[in-house]
Amino acid sequence: MPTLLERVRARRDRRLHEVRHLFRTDVSSRDRWFLGSSAGLIAAGVVAVSVRVLVDGSLVVGVAAAVVGVLLVRAAMLRPATPPHVHGLPGVPEPEVCPAPEPPDRGPFVVAVRWLGAALAFAVAFAPAAVVAVVLALLAVAAAPVLRDKAVLWRARRALRRALVAYEPRFVLGYGGYGGGPIHVGMWEPHLLASGDRGVIVGLRGHYCAELRAAIKPAMPWISTGSDVLGDMRGLTVPSVTTFFYVHNAPGHLKLMGIRSVRHVWLGHGDSDKAGSHHKRHLRYDVLVASGEAAIDRYTRHGVEIPRERFVLLGRPQSGEVLPAATPITEVARPTVLYAPTWTGNGKMTNFSSMYIADRILTALLEAGVDVVFRPHPVFLRDAYWAQRLTELNAILQADHDDPSTPGRHAWGEEAVRGWSVAECMNRSDALVSDVSSVVSDWLASAKPYLMVSMVHDLDAFAEAVPVAAGGYMVDRDLTGLPEVLDEMLHRDPLAEKRRQLKVQVLGEYEGDESARAFSAWVHEMAHTPMVRA
């Protein structure tokens, strides 16, 4: 059992964490802290001068030193933040280095300023004028590096704000992730820009700025925030901006959501039954864009009660690129099957990936007499273990592809993962094998059959926990009966009508590019509608 001292320390640490969190994410809390600390410093100065007057009647030196001291301590009592930088914004030169180099640590100077501020208050109250002058001079020396860095920050923010005012963006696409950017940002940027309005991307991870931009090749200007995101965005949220969009569940987005003059809209990066599609953090958003009624039902099913009026149903704009089946699967002589396993998640609770048994799945597909398009989640390419594993899995398809005694014509590796979009992979395939993934929801637009591998639940619980599975064929993690299930899907397909019904629940009534056009029109409307809070 923890001691009393340990409990006190734990409570203190929790309170400090709460205060820091509010300072980083809440404008009103930050303003209150600023006013409170300023009032405290002024009060300390007044007390010191009053004591001085009582001691020897001297006023001029005490008042002058107190005023200068309060200003110096107020300006230099916190570490200076690293400045933001921007790429692709007219009027602002490209940075020479990305990410920007870390500035020198001013922590020791900040600590010195605080202690010297206390010493100055004592000196003003009791010490001779010469001592007051010495302490004040030391305070000025300690504050100088901090103030110099803060001046650099102020100039950077001012130049960026001026350029943004001239550019007149209507929306911000906030991104606090890292490796998933090519998928998450790339998924939505074209559809946001189709509104005809200008926007900017705000990235919260400066160390990934160069990597993300190289992979995404964004059409919008990219702002990489400094270490004080909320401070940057208070100045960079220019009057033309009405809406912030979010495609990722990064906790860092709370810093952006501290800006209350705009509306905050959740887009997500795919419709699935993973926790990221029904997170309690979504309660904070002003508007949630959902593809269909199934998305709203998902929140309710998981106890996340969000008022219905905060949802807007716009289908999946990306599904317009997915073509419907030209021929029923039962009439295709040699079907092509897309195997698209999801990634392994951030932990056990979010790990639904079938990659652990991918070799057995690929082998079963080859034995079923189909061609295979193997497109694992791109995150696997960045992990050393999975990169080696992918080499082994690709070799299975390579061997069958190169064997003159087999008719197999497969796609894998760079061609399938980076050369083709997800929609292209879908359009080249007649059936899908996946797990708990938004790929399945998008696949519904094709009306083609799909098989889902349940890595966590038994099959009865799987259909209940993941409703989209009801329109597909299912096997458990042991792949029990996989050959028979594949045969049923490829040669009889009794679930065709169920898929058509499920498509409306998941993707809405939209056909073709109707969802994309509805989304861009809605974005344009939001971009030109100022946010008014009660």
Predicted regions and their residues:
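A nucleotide-sugar donor-handling region in carbohydrate enzymes
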Residues: L138-W154, R284-S353
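Donor nucleotide-activated moiety binding/catalytic core segment of transferases
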Residues: Q388-S441
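Catalytic binding pocket for nucleotide-activated donors in carbohydrate/polymer assembly enzymes
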Residues: S438-L507
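C-terminal amphipathic helix plus adjacent low-complexity
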Residues: L490-A534
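Short acidic-hydrophobic, aromatic-tinged amphipathic segments that line or gate anion-handling sites
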Residues: P221-V229, L313-G315, R409-R418, A470-E488
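Conserved catalytic-core segment of nucleotide-activated headgroup transferases in glycan assembly
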Residues: G179-I201, S319-Q398, G508-R517, A534
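Active-site and donor-binding regions of nucleotide-sugar-utilizing enzymes
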Residues: G174-Q318
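N-terminal pre-catalytic "stem/leader" segment of glycosyltransferase-like enzymes
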Residues: D13-R234, R533-A534
